[in-house]
């Protein structure tokens, strides 16, 4: 099972991590919900979510709600909608990656560099 939780302070993530380890042996991890938060606010929330329990994020409205409203009002065309949704998603991916600890690479070129 997975816990789906909104953004919160690091101390709350740590408390949730301890609680899940103690009482929910079937939990595979937690994912952060977007809950229509602005992109920058959600990215700031990623930085707080450093507990090992946190595995990723599930977003929807954060990515498409604003651009969709602009499209429905006729303020942007189809291409503009697609571009804005894609840009929001790319910003969230970059924000997530920037908030995670650096991991060792296992890419073939990295392995060759060690030889």
Regions found by a protein language model. Give the residues of each.
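Conserved mixed alpha/beta catalytic, RNA-binding, or beta-rich assembly cores of soluble enzyme
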Residues: 1, 6-9
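Catalytic-face loop-and-helix region of soluble metabolic enzyme cores
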Residues: 9-102, 107
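Active-site loops and adjacent core secondary-structure elements that bind or stabilize anionic groups
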Residues: 107-115
């Amino acid at each position: 099972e997975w816990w789906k939780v909104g953004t919160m302070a690091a101390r709350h993530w740590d408390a949730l991590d301890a609680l899940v380890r103690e009482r929910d042996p079937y939990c595979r991890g937690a994912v952060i919900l977007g809950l229509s938060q602005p992109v920058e606010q959600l990215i700031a929330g990623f930085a707080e979510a450093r507990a090992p329990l946190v595995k990723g994020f599930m977003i929807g409205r954060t990515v498409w709600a604003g651009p969709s409203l602009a499209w429905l009002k006729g303020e942007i065309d189809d291409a503009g909608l697609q571009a804005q949704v894609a840009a929001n998603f790319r910003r969230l991916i970059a924000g997530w990656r920037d908030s995670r600890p650096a991991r060792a690479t296992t890419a073939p070129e990295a392995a060759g560099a060690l030889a």
